[in-house]
Regions:
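Extended catalytic/binding region for NAD+/ADP-ribose chemistry, centered on the ART fold
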Residues: 23-65
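Active-site and NAD+-binding cores of ADP-ribose-processing enzymes
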Residues: 1-24, 55-177
Length: 177
């Protein structure tokens, strides 16, 4: 069976909701804007991201709908770059250097916060899969420390094979039925 991913907060995946990937505006989180953000689907907890939003981040709960989601699979020829090592981040920073975040400098630049240009990367790949747990375990590079979980970020939704809408309304423990 193909690996399934889930994006929370929308029940449809279309060009109408998709925004072009843009470089990080600052170096506070090093996160780009746009794209389609997702996590691996888990039939018991929906995803690590859903679990994180429900249990850890009440601010996100005010911004995002937790009632709907879309589960999807990727086409076999989808070009997804898996980032799972600190050396790989260093190499990407050399190959796709980014200087735009300096305009919104929030933290001093160090050898621990390497950044690369997501817009340039999107010209070559359909998306990136960030192995957050593998990268952050070493603490050598802190570029992805604020990503919270393993994350799939799609730059191009044409790499999606199919998707299915799901209702993920949490059960109210006070309901009698």
């Amino acid at each position: 069976m193909k690996k399934q991913y889930v994006t929370v907060g929308t029940e449809t995946i279309s060009s109408n909701i998709f925004r072009k990937i843009l470089r990080p505006l600052n170096n506070y989180t090093f996160k780009p804007t746009g794209g389609l953000w997702a996590a691996e689907f888990n039939k018991y907890i929906i995803s690590d991201w859903y679990e994180y939003m429900i249990t850890k981040d009440s601010y996100l709960q005010t911004l995002k709908s937790f009632k709907v989601a879309a589960i999807f699979t990727l086409k076999d020829d989808a070009k997804i770059l898996t980032i799972d090592s600190c050396n790989q981040i260093k190499e990407l920073a050399k190959k796709y250097p980014s200087y735009h975040h300096i305009l919104g400098l929030c933290e001093p630049l160090t050898t621990k916060n390497k950044i690369f240009d997501f817009e340039e990367l999107s010209r070559e790949y359909d998306g990136v899969y960030i192995n957050y747990y593998g990268i952050n375990f070493s603490r050598e590079i802190e570029t992805f420390k604020n990503w919270s979980i393993n994350t799939l970020l799609l730059f191009n939704i044409d790499c999606i094979e199919k998707y299915q809408s799901i209702n993920i309304m949490p059960q109210n423990p006070y309901d009698s039925e």
